[in-house]
Regions:
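An edge-strand/N-cap motif at the start of beta-rich repeat modules
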Residues: 1-31
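Short, conserved, GDST-rich strand-edge loop motifs in beta-rich repeat architectures
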Residues: 11-18, 64-77, 120-146
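Short loop/turn segments immediately following the C-termini of beta-strands
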Residues: 14-16, 66-68, 123-125, 156, ...
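Short loop/turn segments immediately following beta-strands, especially the blade-tip
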Residues: 26-34, 84-91, 153-164, 220-226, ...
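Beta-propeller fold detector
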Residues: 36-43, 93-100, 162-181, 228-232, ...
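Blade-loop segments of beta-propeller domains
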Residues: 37-115, 332
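Beta-rich, blade/repeat-based domains predominating
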Residues: 46-56, 102-113, 132-133, 140-145, ...
Length: 395
């Protein structure tokens, strides 16, 4: 971090009924991660803050509000994506505006500042409705309908506030249903699509979306509308969830159903993915496990991911050609269920430390990162209610 700069960590928190929490908390963080100081918070919106991203030119923070709109003329807040102006001196947040997400349970958000575009992946809920349908031959049958899972493209105004919806892609297909090996959705999680991540590739030409039910990775060309460039079909039982790129353009992906980490070569001329390697994220654990997020170290030598179930953070070394080798792990607080586990973590811009929102323990914890072996050593813990996601900003 440059001399005189201030490092801010924005922590998205989920509100839990009958407890405090929710909103976005603002921490000032020392360069080495040994000091975490709460300086302000936005509690009223979003109540179910999750994924965050930052537009440095506009100095605007974006957040999803992880919920399903409760019906026409909603009584509770609607499913939405929100924008906040970041004070360049203090890092405090001022609400700008919000837009509906055109889909339930927004899981992630990505910004393309040069093209003034914002994207959300809307996961959709697991619940279904049962419709009574009369067939052409006069029989009455049950029809099962699910939420649409979508990726939505918005325009951005000059001040970074969120404009109108420009395009929506509705995912189709399903995986194994019912699937006894996955208790998600009562064994029906793959019954309908669930998009989990949107990420812009390093070239700025493509948007990558992982959809875990039909086991697909979608690549869209970025423009005035979402143009499908390629689709990578994973084997059944994979569950592509989270993806990230290194500086060379290799893509890494966690697999929620298979408990694996994959690596790909990404062709920036066509948007095609070429599989390189995969490794198990587990070390003998036999219970239910669902990998979540991943982070790539700025030096490009290590990738970190977290297991929900085994409740660990695992890091892998990355060879020059993209192959993976498990290098170590640390435990985080035990969760009663993978859906309630620690689900995210974020490396500092310099890579000196990793910041983890340990959800079951209600703490924010920093780990020093070993520069040579990627190892993690606890530095500091501070209390915070139900933390979910972290976004660093240098001011």
């Amino acid at each position: 971090m440059s001399k005189g700069k201030k490092l801010i960590a924005y922590v998205g928190c989920n509100h839990v009924a009958n407890f405090e929490g929710g909103g976005i908390s603002v921490f000032e963080v020392s360069e080495d991660g040994s000091s975490l100081t709460l300086i302000s918070s936005v509690k009223d919106k979003p109540k179910r803050a999750g994924y965050l991203t930052y537009a440095p030119k506009a100095k605007v923070l974006y957040s999803v509000d992880e919920r399903k709109t409760d019906g026409r003329g909603p009584i509770k807040p609607a499913s939405c994506v929100l924008s906040f102006k970041v004070d360049p001196e203090s890092g405090q947040l001022t609400f700008l505006n919000s837009q509906r997400t055109v889909g339930a349970m927004p899981a992630s958000v990505a910004v393309h500042e040069d093209k003034k575009l914002l994207f959300t992946a809307n996961h959709a809920f697991f619940d279904h409705v049962v419709k009574a349908v009369e067939t052409a031959d006069g029989r009455w049958v049950e029809k099962f309908e699910y939420d649409d899972s979508t990726v939505v493209q918005y325009g951005l105004a000059e001040d970074g506030s969120i404009g109108d919806v420009q395009d929506v892609f509705v995912f189709t297909g399903h995986g194994i249903d019912p699937w006894a090996e996955s208790p998600q959705g009562g064994g029906h999680a793959p019954a309908s699509p669930h998009a989990h991540i949107v990420v812009v590739d390093p070239s700025g030409k493509y948007l990558v979306v992982c959809e875990k039910a039909a086991e697909r990775v979608y690549v869209f060309r970025i423009g005035s509308r979402l143009e499908l460039a390629s689709v990578y079909q994973c084997p059944l039982g994979t569950g592509p969830r989270h993806a990230a790129f290194d500086k060379k353009g290799c893509m890494f992906m966690t697999c929620e159903f298979a408990s694996e980490l994959w690596s790909f070569d990404f062709d920036a001329s066509s948007g095609a993915l070429r599989f390189i390697d995969k490794q198990s994220t587990l070390s003998g654990f036999k219970g239910r496990n669902e990998p979540a997020t991943l982070q790539i170290h700025p030096n490009g030598r290590f990738v970190y991911m977290n297991n929900r179930g085994e409740d660990t953070i695992v890091w892998f070394s990355i060879s020059p050609d993209g192959h993976l080798k498990k290098a170590g792990k640390v435990s985080v607080s035990k969760s009663p269920d993978p859906k309630d586990a620690t689900r995210a973590m974020t490396l500092s811009p310099s890579g000196a430390f990793l910041l983890v929102p340990d959800r079951p323990a209600d703490v924010l914890r920093s780990y020093a990162v070993g520069p040579n072996d990627g190892s993690l050593k606890v530095l500091k813990e501070v209390p915070i209610q139900n933390p979910v996601f972290i976004q660093f900003v240098e001011l």
